[in-house]
Amino acid sequence: ATSPRELGRKSLAVNLSDVAAMGAAPVASFLSLSLPPGVTGVWIDAFLAGYHALSTQFGVPLLGGDTTSARDRLTVSVTAIGRAENTHLKRRGDAKPGDRIFVTGYLGDSAQGLQDMLSGRDTPFIALHNKPEPFVNEGIWLGGRNEVHAMMDISDGIASDLLHILQMSGVGAEVSLDMIPTNTPIELAVAGGEDYKLLLTADVGAAARLAEDYKAKFGEPLYEIGRIVAGEEIRWLDRGNPVLIECEGFAHF
């Protein structure tokens, strides 16, 4: 199960990830809790300790919020405020044909962790599900690179999230399944969600240099997984051969 401390940390992490995915620096957050009967002071203290640990790590103060009682269900609502130069903001609708597609880390770990947790298995993937690490400094740095065109974080699975970029940019994509970094079945890597890695497109002429500079700066690779093409859909390839992927990311209601 997810501990209250992990839940507190994760509730802020996913919001910092949203801010970083636009190339912005998070500067503050607001937290609202709706608490059902049975939630103890010990639980609340642990939740806030997890939240505070991450806010301290990235220097993002909690400036306020609200606490109310609920009839039967816990609700956590976080708002993160970010700041960026206008020229550094990265949006979903700016991908261009020829762009190379990158992700900043392994995909599928969180979905595997959720499966393992629900089935009672004790594996290292569970910690990756409960404690996602937002790419805050990486997002800020990528925001300052003009060759990065479109960017977002992967919260719903790359099959779903890449489609958002394509639809808003009016383009298509070719993605090589064999190039996707993963330790899990490819279905989880493609559609699992809650990975909170950054997904970005970069100008083809500067993509190799971008990857080199990123590796030099952060000590981790940018993983190239495909390219933007004309069209309006994702073509999935496996070692150059077209394949059919039937899976959906998380669908918001």
Regions found by a protein language model. Give the residues of each.
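Residue-level signal for inorganic ion chemistry
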Residues: 15, 23, 62, 98, ...
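Glycine-rich anion-binding loops of enzyme active sites
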Residues: 25-115, 227
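Short, conserved charged micro-motifs
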Residues: 41-42, 89, 205-213
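Active-site-proximal betaalpha loop/short-helix elements
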Residues: 38, 112, 130-194, 238
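Short hydrophobic/aromatic beta-strand micro-patches
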Residues: 81, 199-203
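Short, compositionally biased
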Residues: 112-128
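Acidic, Ser/Thr/Pro-rich beta/coil linker or hinge segments at domain junctions
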Residues: 130-133, 211-253
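Glycine-rich anion/phosphate-binding loops
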Residues: 1-14, 38-49
